[in-house]
Amino acid sequence: ARGFNIESLTVAPTDNPRVSRMTIVCPGDDKILDQVRKQLAKLIDVHEVRDFSVEDRDIVDRELILCKIKVDPRQRSEIAEIANIFRAHIADVSPESLIVEATGSEGKIKALLSLLAPYNLLEVARGGRVAMARSLTPTPAAAPQTLSPVA
C-alpha cells in the first residue's frame, strides 16, 4: 500500500531562496518507512531524502508547543512554576488565561502536558518536529550558501 500517516510536517526556508527544508515524521515499520523514502525520492523537486531513524541516530530534534490555559489569579504562580521547571515561558497573559510556550524533545513536551493536564487546558497547538544531525556534514541543499563579493 502507498498510504502512510504523517505524524508531523515542518517546512521552512533555507539560506538558498529556491530551497525549503522539510522535516516529516512518519510512524511505521521498516516496510512503511521504506515506502515513504521511495515516494519522496520520486518527487521531481526533492534534492535529498535523509532518514534519521536509520542513517543517523545521533540527532538533535525539537518541537514547539503553545498551551492556552484558563486560570484564576491563584493558579498563575503554580503554572509559572511548572513552566519554569521545563524552561518554558509565559508567552501571553489575559485576565482569564495564560499561554505557555515551550520547546523540547517529544518526551519533554509530553511531560509538560501531563503536568498541565489537571488545569483547564483550552487549546493546545503543537508545531512539527525539526531535526538535525550532529555530524559536521550539513545536508547539501540546506547548507548556507557561500557569498562572493561583487566586483
Where do the PLM segments sit?
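Long, contiguous binding/interaction regions
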Residues: 1-21, 25-151
